[in-house]
């Protein structure tokens, strides 16, 4: 039994099948990239795995239990960062981290922002930051979270090369410590091929 399992997932949108019969099992320490063309259902699959959406058929299990039966404990173990940063634009970068990680002290939050490349921007309201900087505020949570499972939709959007390298190193560290990372990205991952598992979506199935 793996930590996260997709079992015979079917997803249809506008009378079109995005994928069907999609099954896979993820174990501790896995780093997974969901690939496929635009419209293949990558974001849809991520939302199914978070429990934000339900499949038309099949189920997602966490540690052998259907998500709807273990929703609270699952979400305690999940960090989800979608296309939208999901941050409070009227708050500062530092206030955002305090909001999401109430048990994190100020020093930890400042260090997380520094790791994300936001040193010097801690006290600026997020609505005054660039799109890339706003994305970094959300991604700074990677240095604070205790969640086992990270699901990240295009985390490198609007991030420069150095930022991508830092984020990639943080993901590698998380998986080396037994965590799971699932992401979509159009950018090449600068890591050994042996470290990445790819699940490729076609119109009707996963390869």
UniProtKB/Swiss-Prot annotation:
Keywords: ATP-binding, Cell inner membrane, Cell membrane, Cytochrome c-type biogenesis, Membrane, Nucleotide-binding, Translocase, Transport
Enzyme Commission code(s) on record: 7.6.2.5
Cell location: Cell inner membrane
Reactions catalysed: heme b(in) + ATP + H2O = heme b(out) + ADP + phosphate + H(+)
Cysteine pairings via disulfide bonds: none
One Pfam family hit: ABC_tran
Domain ABC transporter as annotated: residue spans: 4-207
GO molecular function list: ABC-type heme transporter activity; ATP binding; ATP hydrolysis activity
Amino acids binding ATP: 36-43
GO cellular-component term (any): ATP-binding cassette (ABC) transporter complex
Source species, domain of life: Bacteria
Bilayer topology annotation: Peripheral membrane protein
Gene Ontology BP term (one): heme import across plasma membrane
Role this protein plays: Part of the ABC transporter complex CcmAB involved in the biogenesis of c-type cytochromes; once thought to export heme, this seems not to be the case, but its exact role is uncertain. Responsible for energy coupling to the transport system.
Subunit description: The complex is composed of two ATP-binding proteins (CcmA) and two transmembrane proteins (CcmB).
PANTHER family: ABC TRANSPORTER I FAMILY MEMBER 1
Family of this protein: Belongs to the ABC transporter superfamily. CcmA exporter (TC 3.A.1.107) family.
Name of the protein: Cytochrome c biogenesis ATP-binding export protein CcmA
Naturally occurring in which organism (per UniProt): Escherichia coli (strain K12)
């Amino acid at each position: 039994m793996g930590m996260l399992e997709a079992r015979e997932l079917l997803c249809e949108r506008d009378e079109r099948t995005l994928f069907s019969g999609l099954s896979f099992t993820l174990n501790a320490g896995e780093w997974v990239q969901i690939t496929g063309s635009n419209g293949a259902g990558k974001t849809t699959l991520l939302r199914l795995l978070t429990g934000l959406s339900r499949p038309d058929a099949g189920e997602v299990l966490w540690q052998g239990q259907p998500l709807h039966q273990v929703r609270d404990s699952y979400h305690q173990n999940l960090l989800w960062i979608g296309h939208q940063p999901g941050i409070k634009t009227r708050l500062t970068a530092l206030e955002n981290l305090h909001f999401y990680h109430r048990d994190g002290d100020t020093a930890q939050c400042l260090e997380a922002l520094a790791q994300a490349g936001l040193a010097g921007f801690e006290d600026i309201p997020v609505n005054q930051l660039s799109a890339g900087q706003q994305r970094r505020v959300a991604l700074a949570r990677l240095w604070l979270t205790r969640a086992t499972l990270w699901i990240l939709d295009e985390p490198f959007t609007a991030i420069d090369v150095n930022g991508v390298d830092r984020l990639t190193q943080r993901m590698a560290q998380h998986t080396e410590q037994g965590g799971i990372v699932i992401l979509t990205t159009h950018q090449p991952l600068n890591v050994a091929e042996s470290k990445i598992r790819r699940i490729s979506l076609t119109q009707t199935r996963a390869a």
